[in-house]
Amino acid sequence: MGKISSLPTQLFKCCFCDFLKVKMHTMSSSHLFYLALCLLTFTSSATAGPETLCGAELVDALQFVCGDRGFYFNKPTGYGSSSRRAPQTGIVDECCFRSCDLRRLEMYCAPLKPAKSARSVRAQRHTDMPKTQKYQPPSTNKNTKSQRRKGWPKTHPGGEQKEGTEASLQIRGKKKEQRREIGSRNAECRGKKGK
């Protein structure tokens, strides 16, 4: 007695075989090679199981998953951590020696920082500005002192003259003349008293 098979199964087999025969005639041997190669890699990756991540691959995966938040290599301990707890394993132990999935990687991402309120941003603005350089008085070397005694115009550190230097020089000149006159009068008075 022959095998009993249903009509749809026989039709499927015939149609499938005919389809493959037509395809076989039109496919080149290189196409068949690439098709077989794809099937082998697909089946080997499906049976290999989850992949482990170590070293630079692990860091790249964490950076991709966590983004700007950053990540920890050890699970961050909370405020109430106690020494009685079992030693915690790190991401390397979990993902390098065993398989690791996306949820496990996300556990090591740093928490999102809360958005700052408008008040704290305003209060922080003055601290974000770069510090200005402190004013340094000009050096007091002999040339500068002699220039001041001679009544030369003062200059800013940038080399520019102060506004109104001509007027201030005239005032200084008048004051010097007044001092000389007072000094000469005092000398005359002293000379008369000594006689």
Curated annotation (Swiss-Prot):
GO terms for molecular function: growth factor activity; hormone activity; insulin receptor binding; insulin-like growth factor receptor binding; integrin binding; transmembrane receptor protein tyrosine kinase activator activity. Residues 49-77 are annotated as: B. Residues 111-118 are annotated as: D. SUPFAM superfamilies: Insulin-like. Residues 22-48, 119-195 form a propeptide. It is found in: Secreted. Residues 1-21 form the signal peptide. GO terms for cellular component: alphav-beta3 integrin-IGF-1-IGF1R complex; exocytic vesicle; extracellular region; extracellular space; glutamatergic synapse; insulin-like growth factor binding protein complex; insulin-like growth factor ternary complex; neuronal dense core vesicle lumen. One of its GO terms (biological process) is blood vessel remodeling. Pfam families: Insulin. Keywords: Deafness, Disulfide bond, Dwarfism, Growth factor, Intellectual disability, Secreted, Signal. Forms a ternary complex with IGFR1 and ITGAV:ITGB3. Forms a ternary complex with IGFR1 and ITGA6:ITGB4. Interacts with SH2D3C isoform 2. Forms a ternary complex with IGFBP3 and ALS. Belongs to the insulin family. This is Insulin-like growth factor 1. It comes from Homo sapiens.
